[in-house]
């Protein structure tokens, strides 16, 4: 166990250096909730009973961090996640969600505020534990300015943190490294509570081989460590691809370690 780890028989926890939150090392991504045929036969809808069961199982086994977004599961992830989690005491889980105003028609302050306030309604909460600017770097500096800077939304989110409606403010990163570096350069002013990056054994030094827009996690993590900003990891298995090795790679690994 490293510094800040609390081993238990079910889960390892990390204590946030900024808030003291005791967060499970394994979080639950709510981007792909199970679906079932729609009652009217037109497409699919979220299987709420299945979601409830998955959330119950996760909490029973020590998971207490749930990551969602207004953009996930055709816009219905937050509602399904809120229904499932609201059946548990509020102090038993942390909710992470995002201001996912990707489309230019949601860049206005009014549209962004509607999205932000809707998250509270859908999640059935009066505060959000971890709020992220979603996917900064996608669209470069122009998108960052349109989504968060020119409309005053970053300043608004900082004030919401001061008011206690946001407990931790951070961002998730894909794409243009200029945007990542710019936001970190403002850390002394903004005081980022955490940053979410893509990190796994491929992306550590070979990120561009899986996606040319990405930057090696070694650099991303290093920049956070230099500033003492806690990191949250997404895609530890590269969207599941690292859990399904092809026969050639399995053979090579077995040559190295037959056991």
Regions found by a protein language model. Give the residues of each.
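Active-site mouth loops of central-metabolism enzymes
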Residues: 31-49, 98-111, 142-145, 175, ...
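N-terminal binding-site loop/beta-alpha segment at the start of enzyme catalytic domains
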Residues: 1-93, 126, 151, 156, ...
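Short amphipathic alpha-helices and their capping/turn segments at secondary-structure boundaries
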Residues: 9-21, 82-86, 112-123, 180-187, ...
């Amino acid at each position: 166990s490293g510094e800040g780890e609390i081993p238990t028989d079910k889960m390892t926890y990390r204590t946030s250096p900024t808030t003291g939150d005791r967060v499970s090392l394994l979080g639950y991504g709510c981007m792909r909730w199970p679906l079932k045929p729609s009652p009217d036969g037109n497409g699919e809808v979220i299987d709420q009973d299945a979601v409830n069961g998955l959330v119950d199982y996760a909490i029973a086994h020590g998971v207490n961090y749930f990551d969602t977004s207004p953009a996930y599961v055709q816009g219905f992830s937050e509602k399904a996640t809120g229904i499932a989690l609201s059946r548990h005491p509020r102090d038993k889980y942390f909710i992470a969600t995002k201001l996912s105003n990707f489309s230019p028609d949601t860049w206005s302050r009014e549209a962004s505020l509607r999205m932000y306030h809707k998250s509270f309604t859908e999640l059935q909460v009066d505060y959000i534990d971890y709020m992220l600017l979603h996917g900064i770097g996608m669209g470069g500096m122009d998108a960052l300015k349109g989504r968060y800077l020119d409309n005053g939304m970053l300043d608004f989110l900082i004030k919401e943190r001061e008011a206690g409606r946001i407990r931790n403010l951070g961002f998730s990163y894909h794409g243009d490294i200029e945007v990542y570096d710019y936001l970190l350069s403002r850390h002394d002013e903004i005081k980022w509570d955490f940053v979410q990056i893509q990190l796994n054994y491929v992306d550590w030094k070979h990120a561009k081989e899986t996606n040319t827009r990405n930057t090696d996690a070694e650099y991303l993590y290093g920049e956070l460590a230099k500033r003492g900003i806690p990191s949250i990891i997404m895609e530890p298995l590269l969207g599941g691809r690292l859990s399904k090795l092809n026969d050639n790679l399995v053979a090579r690994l077995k040559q190295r370690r037959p056991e």
